[in-house]
Regions:
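Residue-level preference for the first positions of well-ordered beta-strands
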Residues: 77-81, 106-108, 141-143, 202-206, ...
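Acidic, glycine-rich loop-and-beta core segments that form the ion-binding/anion-interacting portion
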Residues: 100-171
């Protein structure tokens, strides 16, 4: 999990609160950062446009007594960083936000999902995480799409590939550097043929990109190549067997692309979390490709080594 205390953001790794700038995620080739102290992070990401001393801080002590007066005093698009250790902290904060908004205040959030849970005042999800196989369509095997290549994701992939009923399909993305459109289409068809064969055998294919991160001269070239990889993965999503039982998307960018591009969703029904930090949504009953399909959104930096295998096992449990 993650917490923010005294405006320092921590990732909890094996029970140890670790400032996020010390984790592998801070060294990302595109989204790197050097600060865990959020006012300094804001300055870094705005390239000095917002000085750290201008960033408002809502500490735990503020959150737990109420922040409404300070929210009402904010003006001129001030930036605020917010502490939080548990859902209760955000419940109180969300209540103050809603009250301030009802009095004319407007807020723009950059946040994780916890604040949405509080703003929507969601209670317990209707079906517990351990029983979410009830959403799996007709008890059919699913598909896992994995774009994230960070160390944590690779550890989770290794565990998943050992699970019964799982068959891996590695996509060597280096082929996308120079291949022609014809070669790309041949690669896509080869992958889809493997997926159908695995699915028809009653097993779950795991489509994952090669684990080696390629090096590029500029961030722009890196992003352009990332778009090529994403385009291939989304073509795979659109070409999956129509009767798959579920879809698990691993990686934050991959998950966003699966929803917005692969499935072309405008809206989705949120079913809850199948694992802490992993939301599950369902497509509409009239979706043109996959009606009522449960889709797991699994960020790259979430879960322990067994997290991905746990989600797969929860969705694959036989129903009586």
């Amino acid at each position: 999990g993650r917490i923010t205390r005294n405006s320092i953001h921590y990732l909890i790794i094996d029970g140890v609160e670790t400032p996020v700038h010390l984790t592998e995620f801070a060294k990302d080739s595109v989204f790197a950062y050097q600060h865990s102290y959020l006012p300094d992070y804001v300055t870094e990401k705005t390239k000095g446009l917002i000085p750290s001393e201008k960033v408002e801080q809502f500490l735990l002590s503020d959150m737990r007594v109420g922040t409404l007066p300070r929210l009402m005093d904010l003006t001129g698009n001030q930036c605020v960083v917010v502490d939080g250790e548990n859902q209760g902290d955000f419940d109180q904060f969300a209540s103050d936000i809603i009250t301030a908004a009802s009095q004319g205040k407007r807020f723009l959030f950059r946040s994780a999902a916890s604040i949405l849970t509080s703003l929507a005042a969601l209670g317990k999800q209707p079906i517990p995480a351990e029983e979410m196989a009830k959403y799996t369509r007709n008890g059919k095997p699913g598909v896992v799409i994995m774009g994230s290549y960070v160390k944590k994701s690779t550890q989770q992939l290794e565990q998943l590939l050992q699970a019964p009923g799982i068959v891996g399909i590695e996509v060597d993305v280096s082929h996308l550097l120079e291949e022609s459109e014809t070669q790309r289409q041949e690669l896509l068809q080869q992958i889809l043929d493997q997926i159908y064969a695995i699915h028809n055998a009653g097993q779950t294919p795991v489509i994952y990109t090669s684990r080696q991160e390629l090096q590029f001269d500029t961030v722009e070239i890196r992003l352009a190549f990332g778009s090529k990889v994403s385009d291939l993965l989304m073509d795979i999503v659109r070409g999956l067997p129509p009767d798959i039982g579920f879809l698990i998307s691993k990686g934050g960018i991959t998950s966003n692309d699966v929803l917005s591009k692969g499935l072309s969703l405008k809206t989705a029904r949120l079913l809850g979390q199948v694992l802490a930090g992993c939301s599950m949504v369902k497509t509409a009953s009239n979706h043109p490709l996959y009606p009522n399909l449960p889709v797991v959104l699994f960020p790259g930096n979430v879960g322990d080594a067994k997290g991905l295998a746990t989600v797969y096992q929860r969705l694959s449990q036989p129903q009586t």
